[in-house]
Regions:
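Extended alpha-helical targeting/anchoring segments
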Residues: 1-331
């Protein structure tokens, strides 16, 4: 598959000692082409899975109470934004690798990963760079501002218009752009930090997001782990200012976050670093699957809306887990 040209090249080797080689190759090419087109994308339900199938670390009323408490902290000047999350847990009887396959089909994302840690598995489809370092260049790509996908193209476009005209979402995103600039500014050469993409909309299977791109050139002798240390945790999953936001998260969230909002990536022998923010990520352990999702709380937040945002973000993983529980011949 050619990602640049967005096309597939099919190559068949012909045997030169057979008179029918040309016809055989054409037949095989047709067979492969038919296989490529055989599986149509699944129709993805936009409805929430049956709530009786999963439990939450936050009852809905408790989550909304935590949102109101966070807004009190914001009104008192403690903090500008806090990202509150809930963890959803349900039974999982399938194979973890089938969960990865289902997620790859239903919610393809820039970062796809399957980590088998023997007694548990981590499976994810993260849309967001935590931080990337290549040669002397570093990138952070804040994602903030969310709407569910529309059922029709017209509804989808209307959701995008609503998202880009929502003062609350825009203010939240601008705050996180500034935080990203500040994070990489600590390890970048003076004058090198720039905003290369500003407030574009990216679409995924169940949600769309506002996304921006911030780049800088690192100070000489800066190591990859210095870069990770300067940018972790991401403001998009903690808040601003970070330390006070994390204190409030520790107070209000009923469970420690674990892998959620951490980092998954690699450090190469050449010193390059590429890390995904571990959101849209599931942990499977002891026949249970755990999915966590958050929402950025600001002064204008509506508790019910923020709860719905966490559910929308968890949707792709919950639906993929349902598919992975089915016999694979039914896919």
């Amino acid at each position: 598959f050619d990602n640049l040209e967005n096309c597939i090249h099919i190559v068949i080797n012909a045997k030169t000692d057979k008179k029918t080689s040309y016809e055989d190759c054409n037949t095989r090419l047709s067979e492969i082409e038919n296989l490529i087109h055989q599986k149509e994308p699944d129709e993805i339900s936009k409805k929430y899975p049956d709530k009786s199938q999963f439990t939450s670390s936050f009852k809905k009323e408790n989550f909304m109470k935590a949102v109101r408490k966070t807004k009190d902290y914001i009104a008192n000047g403690d903090v500008m934004q806090v990202v509150l999350s809930q963890r959803l847990t349900k039974k999982f009887q399938g194979k973890p690798i089938d969960m990865y396959d289902a997620l790859r089909d239903m919610n393809p994302s820039p970062y796809m990963y399957f980590l088998d840690m023997e007694d548990f598995q981590i499976i994810g489809s993260s849309p967001e760079i935590l931080v990337k370092m290549e040669d002397d260049n570093i990138t952070v790509r804040p994602i903030a501002g969310t709407r569910p996908r529309g059922i029709t193209e017209a509804e989808d476009l209307q959701h995008e218009i609503d998202l880009l005209s929502d003062p609350k979402e825009l203010a939240e995103h601008l705050m996180l752009i500034d935080l990203g600039r500040n994070d990489i500014g600590k390890i970048s050469k003076i004058g090198s930090v720039e905003l290369t993409e500003r407030m574009i909309v990216e679409r995924y299977s169940h949600v769309m997001h506002i996304v921006s791109n911030v780049k800088g050139t690192i100070i000489d002798r800066t190591k990859p782990l210095d870069v990770l240390r300067a940018t972790f945790p991401a403001g998009t999953v903690s808040g601003a200012p970070k330390i006070r936001a994390m204190e409030i998260i520790n107070e209000l969230e009923p469970l420690k976050r674990g892998i959620y909002s951490g980092a998954i990536g690699y450090l190469s022998w050449t010193g390059d670093l590429d890390t995904a923010l571990s959101i849209r990520t599931a942990v499977i352990k002891d026949d249970l699957i755990h999915v966590q999702a958050g929402a950025g709380i600001v002064y204008d937040s509506v508790p019910e809306t923020e709860w719905e945002e966490t559910m929308n973000k968890a949707m792709a993983l919950l639906k993929a887990s349902e598919k992975a529980n089915e016999p694979k011949e039914d896919w």
